[in-house]
Amino acid sequence: MTTYLFTSESVSEGHPDKIADQISDAVLDAILEQDPKARVACETYVKTGMVMVGGEITTSAWVDIEEITRQTVREIGYVNSEMGFDANSCAVLSAIGKQSPDINQGVDREDPLQQGAGDQGLMFGYATNETDVLMPAPITYAHRLVQRQAEVRKNGVLPWLRPDAKSQVTFQYNNDKIVGVDAVVLSTQHAENISQKDLQEAVMEEIIKPVLPAEWLNPTTKYFINPTGRFVIGGPMGDCGLTGRKIIVDTYGGMARHGGGAFSGKDPSKVDRSAAYAARYVAKNIVAAGLADRCEIQVSYAIGVAEPTSIMVETFGTEKVSTATLTLLVREFFDLRPHGLIQMLDLLHPIYRDTAAYGHFGRPQFPWEATDKAEALRDAAGLKLSAMNM
C-alpha cells in the first residue's frame, strides 16, 4: 500500500495577485463585449494606493479602463482606506500599446480555420474522478475555503474579515484514494479589534466545518488558522500584485503539469489560455466517459500555425482502452486548431472576469467544463455505460 500526502493552496479574490488578474480580465471582458475579434494582452500591477494597467490591445472598442479598474476593486471589497487600499481614491495609470503587426500576420487568415496560434507553447489539461467536478480534491477544497471566506465576509456573518486570504489543504492518500485531510491552513486578513481566539473559533465554525466533508476530518487533522497571530495589514498594502503570478492556483494545484503560460488578460487567440481550456475539456470528457480514472492532455503549438505540433494523452495506468486509441479519439472528436477550439468552446464572449478568482477549472458555469462529448467517446471506444459502472 502506497501512502502519501499531497497539498494544494488557493488565495482569495482580495489577494494582490488576484486583484491584478481580475482587473486584467475585467478589461478583456469589456472589450470583447464590443469587439469579439479584439486582440488583448492586458497586464496589471497593484501596490499601495495605485494600479497600473499595461499591455498590448488592438481593438475597435473604447472602454474606460479607470472606471473598470475602480469597479473591480470595489466589488472585491477594498472600499476603505483603513484596509490599506481604496477603490475610490487609488491612482489608476494606463500604459497600453497595440499588438505587434508581426504577430497579426501570423494569426489572422482569410480562412478562419487556418487561424494561426498566437504564440508557440505547450499547455496541459487534467481531470480525475476523485471529486464530483472531476478535479483534484486538494485544490478543489482549497478554493472552496477561500470562496466561503469571501461569502461570510460579504454577507455580514463575519463582518470583521477583510478581503485578503489564503488557504492550504493537505490530503492523505492510500493507493491514490483519499483517506482523509491531514492539515488545513487558513490565513485571513481581519480588522484590528478581533481577538485571535475569537477569530480562530469563528473561522473553524463558519468557514472550515461547512466546507470540508466531516468524513475526511479526524482527531489527528491539524488546523493552522492565522498561525502568525495577526493579519491586519494585507492586500496591496502588504504585497504588490501582478497578473499571472498564481498559475498553479488557477489550474490543478500542482497535481498536474503546467506549460508555464498564465491566463488572465489574454483573448482566446492566445493559446496559453484557450488551448489550456480545451485540454481540460478533452481530459474531463475522457474521464466522464469512464475511459480513464485520471487523464492528462498535453497540446503544443508553433506561432502562426493552425495545427497543433503535438497531442499527448497520459492516463497513469488507469485507462480502460489503450492510450493510442484515446489519442485517435481526441483527434477525431476535438478540433484543437485555434479557430476550432474557440468555436468548440464558444470563447468569444465576456466570460473571463469570473475565471480570475477561485480557479479556472472545476466550476460548471464555464463551457470547457461540459461533458457533452462523453457519451460519443464512450460509444466510439466500444464501452457501454453499464460496463463502466457509471
Swiss-Prot record:
Protein's cellular compartments: Cytoplasm
GO CC terms, sorted: cytoplasm
Cofactor note: Binds 2 divalent ions per subunit.
Residues the entry annotates as binding K(+): 43
Residue numbers spanned by region Flexible loop: 99-109
Cofactors named for this entry: Mg(2+); K(+)
UniProt entry tagged with the keyword tRNA-binding: no
Pfam families with a match to the protein in the record: S-AdoMet_synt_C, S-AdoMet_synt_M, S-AdoMet_synt_N
GO biological process: one-carbon metabolic process; S-adenosylmethionine biosynthetic process
Residues the record lists as binding L-methionine: 56, 99, 239, 270
Gene Ontology MF term list: ATP binding; magnesium ion binding; methionine adenosyltransferase activity
Binding site for Mg(2+): 17
Positions annotated to bind ATP: 15, 164-166, 230-231, 239, 245-246, 262, 266
Keywords per UniProt: ATP-binding, Cytoplasm, Magnesium, Metal-binding, Nucleotide-binding, One-carbon metabolism, Potassium, Transferase
EC number of the protein: 2.5.1.6
Pathway annotation: Amino-acid biosynthesis; S-adenosyl-L-methionine biosynthesis; S-adenosyl-L-methionine from L-methionine: step 1/1
Catalytic activity line of the entry: L-methionine + ATP + H2O = S-adenosyl-L-methionine + phosphate + diphosphate
KW ATP-binding (keyword) present: yes
PROSITE patterns found in the cross-reference section: ADOMET_SYNTHASE_1, ADOMET_SYNTHASE_2
PANTHER family, per database record: S-ADENOSYLMETHIONINE SYNTHETASE (PTHR11964)
General function of this protein: Catalyzes the formation of S-adenosylmethionine (AdoMet) from methionine and ATP. The overall synthetic reaction is composed of two sequential steps, AdoMet formation and the subsequent tripolyphosphate hydrolysis which occurs prior to release of AdoMet from the enzyme.
Family: Belongs to the AdoMet synthase family.
Subunit structure and binding partners: Homotetramer; dimer of dimers.
Protein name per UniProt: S-adenosylmethionine synthase
Gene that this sequence comes from: metK
